Amino acid sequence: MTERKTQIVVVGGGAGGVELVRKLGAKYGRARHDIILVEKNRTHIWKPLLHEVAAGALDANLDEVGYRSHCHRWGYRYFFGTLESIDRDNGQVVLAPLLDEDGAELVARHAIRYDYLVLAIGSVTNDFGTPGVTEHCLFLDDRAAADRFRNRLLNHCLRVSREMTVNPAADAHVRIVIVGGGATGVELAAELYNSAAALRHYGLEVFDESRLQVSVVEAGPRILPALPARPAAAAHAELEALGVTVLTGVRVSAAEADTIVTADGG
């Protein structure tokens, strides 16, 4: 009689989840343990790099890791799908139906048995229930969101470049508001200016960083609150030297299609 393997299911293939299945696979292998990763994306990219993907400074295809090749190397199995529910009584996770781009079902809803279950689903941006944010704002939570931001940025830059070609005196700008002065917001603001300076070499001859208007809005008294005051102040000064408008002590109360509304009515 074949001995039943101990089944360890890890849901979420972010930095924590993918490192866990790698270590479990390396330590236990496939002989007596069945290690399974459930992840809704096909590739992994380190989340702190998403601002570089969004700004166009990093080609994610060169830095991402494909789960299928990674699982083969490290001794675990990969299930492409999204967690729908957990059946604790029967020791199962239920994966939602897998649909294609047209909404047709590829894989029906199904369950995976577990002896040990690890939820490593990570975090997502909190919109704090602010009206209009879900409808009108972009979030840097994953590779797909970073790609959407980059594509929208390039489209706006192309529009401004074309407008300036037709009318060199046009007051055309790409305006970006970044809500949150933490590490991601600050790094994204700086990277946007670096990327804008390079666009002229990629077909947008009349576009440069002077046509970019970036604002960082932070509700707290200063940006980079996790850092000591001195390096945070230095980063603030560097952003302003690039041309970034840094607003501290400002809380966003609503978002509209082409503007944000602050609590003080600005």
Give the predicted meaning of each segment.
Residues E135-E238, L242, V246-T248:
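Predominantly flavin-linked oxidoreductase catalytic cores and closely associated redox partners
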Residues V11-G12, L119, V179-G180:
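Conserved N-terminal Rossmann-fold NAD(P)-binding element of oxidoreductases
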Residues A96, A120-I121, T248-V250, A263:
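Short, well-ordered coil/turn residues at beta-beta hairpins
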Residues G75-D87, E240-A255:
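A conserved beta-strand/loop element that lines the FAD pocket in flavoprotein oxidoreductases
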Residues M1-K5, Y76-V177:
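FAD-binding core/adjacent interface of flavoenzyme oxidoreductases
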Residues T2-S85, A183-L227:
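Beta1-alpha1 glycine-rich phosphate/pyrophosphate-binding loop at the start
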